[in-house]
């Protein structure tokens, strides 16, 4: 891609997201969504392969449909309230349609169908943007309207997303699809607590983005896209391979790693609100995600696939890539659980 075009596309993506996050007028929010969607399409298609074009087309159709539903809800609310203000939603039907539109943009169940397919058809760098940065704009709008959204609808969507995120990843060998289903499950956890403590959703989002970014950087360092190529990374860089598996267990929420912290705090918050059945179901379904991460760890570390490279490290296998940010990121996002008391005072 032309460097100048790449800079312009990146700035447009950032600007579109910033417009959505800082606007209080629905028309500006819609414009920000459209800017972001149109700018991300070339990023998804930068490989110029049929699979990438297919993924970009699926992404475009889904996001365009969600934007149409969002404008339908906004106009419906305008007819009843006469206002374009984001936080002023008076009509229950408009609130429900608006929530479903944002759920579709986030890729939550039952509108999760596009996330694994799009993530699988694009390169790792584009997948990183899709599963992290692209969550900011819809979730910020959902955060602003959380006071007028039906808690029952949010909890139903969150439980379905956690279940789909766990079940969907069980039979996968493609790392991008595994991370896509993990994203669906994590978004389910965020929406579950949104009606009770929206600020806790921001903590979960921050930790999710940082852990997912670290995981993608490790995969890009190893050039790993499947469990087979991930198992071969032991011969090239054993420490990086070990770190990759540790951060993936953290994504699964295994204590005492960092990924356990947001789940712990969300279950605690739901219990405070006299909701016992919901956190119990969420904790049980979270075991599905943890299971496929532990199975992945076992298959890539304790067993080795048949390969000509299962020998001692050779000079031609030495990895010359240097990523200075990886060591502190790996350390922080696997061993940050002792920060829980400090974070609990903030959230």
Swiss-Prot record:
Its EC number is 7.1.1.2. Keywords: Electron transport, Membrane, Mitochondrion, Mitochondrion inner membrane, NAD, Respiratory chain, Translocase, Transmembrane, Transmembrane helix, Transport, Ubiquinone. InterPro entries: Complex_I_Subunit_2, NADH_DH_su2_C, NADH_UbQ_OxRdtase_chain2, ND/Mrp_TM. The chain crosses the membrane at residues 13-33, 59-79, 96-116, 122-142, 149-169, 178-198, 201-221, 247-267, 274-294, 323-343. GO terms for molecular function: NADH dehydrogenase (ubiquinone) activity. The keyword Oxidoreductase does not apply. It is a multi-pass membrane protein. It is an enzyme of class 7 (translocase). One of its GO terms (biological process) is mitochondrial respiratory chain complex I assembly. It catalyses: a ubiquinone + NADH + 5 H(+)(in) = a ubiquinol + NAD(+) + 4 H(+)(out). It is found in: Mitochondrion inner membrane. GO terms for cellular component: mitochondrial inner membrane. Its main location: mitochondrion. Belongs to the complex I subunit 2 family. Core subunit of respiratory chain NADH dehydrogenase (Complex I) which is composed of 45 different subunits. Interacts with TMEM242. Core subunit of the mitochondrial membrane respiratory chain NADH dehydrogenase (Complex I) which catalyzes electron transfer from NADH through the respiratory chain, using ubiquinone as an electron acceptor. Essential for the catalytic activity and assembly of complex I. PANTHER family: NADH-UBIQUINONE OXIDOREDUCTASE CHAIN 2. This is NADH-ubiquinone oxidoreductase chain 2. It comes from Megaderma spasma.
